[in-house]
Amino acid sequence: MISKINFVKMHGLGNDFVIVNKRDLSSSYDLSQLAKNMAERHTGIGCDQFIIYEEHNDFYEMIIYNIDGSSAKLCGNATRCLAKLIYLDTGKQDITVMVGNKKLLCNVNDENNISVNVGSVSFNEAWMPNRDKVWEFAERYMIDLKETICVDIGNPHVVIFSKLEPQDQKIVGERLQAKELFADGVNVNFAEVKDNKIYLSVWERGAGLTLACGSGACGSFAAGLKRGFIHSPSTIVFKHGNLTMKEENGNIIMQGAATLVARGEYYCEQ
């Protein structure tokens, strides 16, 4: 039996998503498998993450799946995309998005300028692996741990301010997913600071290297502030555009564009 699923394809600075309203899904779908199928770039629609959303009385619930079918706890770029989609469909400009118990306050200033208040971040390193293991790993790849910091923005990030070549970023990103280092994996940010800007590339847990990462931008901005490398406001630079970041009363606010690519129907065999 073949069923149709309405979907929207969007991206934030090249970080792309397939977005589906929960009302268009039957309860019989295996959502993890559906995410893997729709995310496949050759036989599906293709995306970095698969997003399901549902409208409630005063907020929208967002569920995030990685391309390997695992779940994610936060995605800043997907939040901006969802806020823009809701704005286009309803005209709402102030939108609250819930991901688990994380509340994200969004404002659509215009179609190309969406801000998301992601709240506060935590530098509690309770989820960090044994320091000896980290030192051994860092020495192997010539990473300066004095310029490396862990930050939890709703999902875990390691921010590395040492300069690594792209091929080394891939290796380090992959190998930091080892269970003996981070039991649940980790998002790895490679940050280079110039003139109060952070030039950023991110290895996302469950997705690999992506063209942009909103939660990585928030975590790296917070880490840069803590280390004194930058001041607020600042700019995060990705390959396909920038995000403006600022800190207000302990909250991190991200601002940038989101792009609608397509609306369509996906044919799903059940």
Swiss-Prot record:
It holds the Pfam family DAP_epimerase. The active site is at C75, C213. It is found in: Cytoplasm. Keywords: Amino-acid biosynthesis, Cytoplasm, Isomerase, Lysine biosynthesis. Its EC number is 5.1.1.7. The record marks H157, E204 as: Could be important to modulate the pK values of the two catalytic cysteine residues. Pathway: Amino-acid biosynthesis; L-lysine biosynthesis via DAP pathway; DL-2,6-diaminopimelate from LL-2,6-diaminopimelate: step 1/1. Gene3D superfamilies: Diaminopimelate Epimerase, Chain A, domain 1. GO terms for biological process: lysine biosynthetic process via diaminopimelate. GO terms for cellular component: cytosol. It catalyses: (2S,6S)-2,6-diaminopimelate = meso-2,6-diaminopimelate. Belongs to the diaminopimelate epimerase family. Catalyzes the stereoinversion of LL-2,6-diaminopimelate (L,L-DAP) to meso-diaminopimelate (meso-DAP), a precursor of L-lysine and an essential component of the bacterial peptidoglycan. PANTHER family: DIAMINOPIMELATE EPIMERASE, DIAMINOPIMELATE EPIMERASE, CHLOROPLASTIC. Homodimer. HAMAP family: DAP_epimerase. This is Diaminopimelate epimerase. It comes from Rickettsia africae (strain ESF-5). The gene is dapF.
